[in-house]
């Protein structure tokens, strides 16, 4: 399966569940055969203001790829700015 230029080895994708899909849980799912990891939902404003808890939600390790991040917010300009910034990090997919 492919999403854009991201190759996913199977059709099993982890949903971005707030309070659930932290790094240890994602690694466990990857170990069990999940093809696409996804972080918890992340607030664009929290990223803008460098919120430490939000940075913790986005922690990752190379072995969990491909990795998607789901970004939410209400201001289109902030969303666009943060999506662009996050695209320069280790995420393969930014879901807005």
Language-model features, listed with the residues they occupy:
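Short beta-strand/loop segments at the ligand-binding rim of alpha/beta enzyme cores
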Residues: 7-12, 65-68
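Glycine-rich, positively charged N-terminal anion/phosphate-binding segment
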Residues: 2, 17-92
């Amino acid at each position: 399966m492919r999403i854009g230029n991201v190759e996913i080895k199977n059709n099993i994708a982890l949903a971005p569940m707030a309070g659930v899909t932290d790094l240890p849980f994602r690694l466990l799912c990857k170990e069990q055969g999940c093809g696409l990891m996804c972080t918890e939902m992340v607030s664009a404003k929290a990223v803008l203001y460098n919120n430490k808890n939000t940075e913790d939600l986005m922690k990752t390790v190379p072995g969990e790829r491909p990795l998607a991040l789901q970004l939410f917010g209400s201001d289109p300009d902030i969303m666009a700015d943060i999506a662009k910034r996050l695209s320069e990090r280790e995420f393969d997919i930014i879901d807005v």
